[in-house]
Amino acid sequence: MFGAFIIGDELLVGKREDKHLGFLIGALAKRGLRLAWAHYLGDEPARLTEALKRSFASSEVVFSFGGIGATPDDHTRQCVAAALQVPLVLHPDAEREIRTRFAGQEVTPQRLQMGEFPRGAAIIPNPVNRIPGFSVGEHHFVPGFPQMAWPMVESVLDTRYRERFGSGKWAEASVLVFEAGESQLIPAMQAVERSFAGIKVFSLPSMGADGSRIHVELGVRGDPAQVGAAMERLRREVGAAGFPHK
């Protein structure tokens, strides 16, 4: 199972629009994988630390975007260390990358702070400016800049999780139902979910500008081997209930 943390006050106050969620969904889908959940978090250390504690207690693969720099509003590195109850230490590989990045310039303590990761972490190379991200177990922490974060995430997927590619394949099919409210379609939906363990049923109502109901998109998604039969069963249930559909 794959999850995501997307971190930064700038997202929650509307100063920046998130692009990471759409990217991650697409990057996983290209590899036959699916995103199970995503959480947006501000730059609030206590809340972030608690969220990380819960996440580290699971066996899920988690990508975290943002907050790994060295400015006062960057808390992710510190919160990961707090959640794991380990110190931040200057990672030798990160130090080497930082010194290479700033060759010929003063390598200040502030610059080296960007390479201080929770003890036991591994670095994620940054192909853009060489300031790395880091991994702790199945959790992977990358910068908030898409041009840096995205190739780093794809590299992690391709080097760490190739054996899982295709494990999250799914399919979807739907039908438009007219002259019915969602509540009237519940029996049909329940009948399908009872009969097909690998299938989820969904309903998406559409409204006109005046609030009048136009139709309900009713569908199934899940195991590709079951979608066809589940959709046929759903059509039969809707037809038996007397609702027009196409």
Locations of the language-model features?
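N-terminal small/polar loop signature for handling phosphorylated ligands or for N-terminal nucleophile
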Residues: G22-A83
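Generic secondary-structure signature for well-ordered alpha-helical cores
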Residues: A29, L33-R34, D43, A57, ...
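Proline/glycine-rich low-complexity loops and linkers
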Residues: R47-E50, D74-R164
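An accessory alpha-helical subdomain
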Residues: E138-E237
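Glycine-rich phosphate/diphosphate-binding loop of Rossmann-like nucleotide-binding domains
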Residues: M1-A38, D43, G228-A229
